[in-house]
Amino acid sequence: MCHAREASPGTGEPEAAPRDNFPRAAGSKRGVGAAFETRAQRFLERAGLALVARNVTVRGGEIDLVMRERDGTLVFVEVRARANSRYGGAAASIGARKRMRLLLAAHAFWARTGGANACRFDVVAFEGSRLVWLRDAFRADDAG
């Protein structure tokens, strides 16, 4: 019974366990992600950035946070969390394919808002309980 949970109330049938074998409430992955995004947003606001948009979804990608620096620079933020830093940690989990999707989404957002401001790509990574802010984590010309 390694890959089954206790019997469901009322049915007596065991529920299938998640693939990674760690139990979690239904929909909690999205809730956990939202909680980390909120923590990242608050951190960046305390650092002087202003929220422009959150969870921007365009064809081909999603941007967790769009912030604005005091000088007007748009900051596209990817929020990542990992329980520990094995396998390179949270920031290392943003591969070339993810960077390309972020670039496409950012370009669409930037163009839709007039395209006049400078922009950059930051990563806020949570490694266990530690927050790491990687300013200018990657550039459009090194995304591939």
Curated annotation (Swiss-Prot):
Pfam families in alphabetical order: UPF0102 (PF02021)
Annotated family: Belongs to the UPF0102 family.
Protein name, as recorded: UPF0102 protein BURPS1106A_3900
GO MF annotation list: nucleic acid binding
PANTHER family named in the record: UPF0102 PROTEIN YRAN
Location of region: Disordered: 1-28
HAMAP family, alphabetized: UPF0102 (MF_00048)
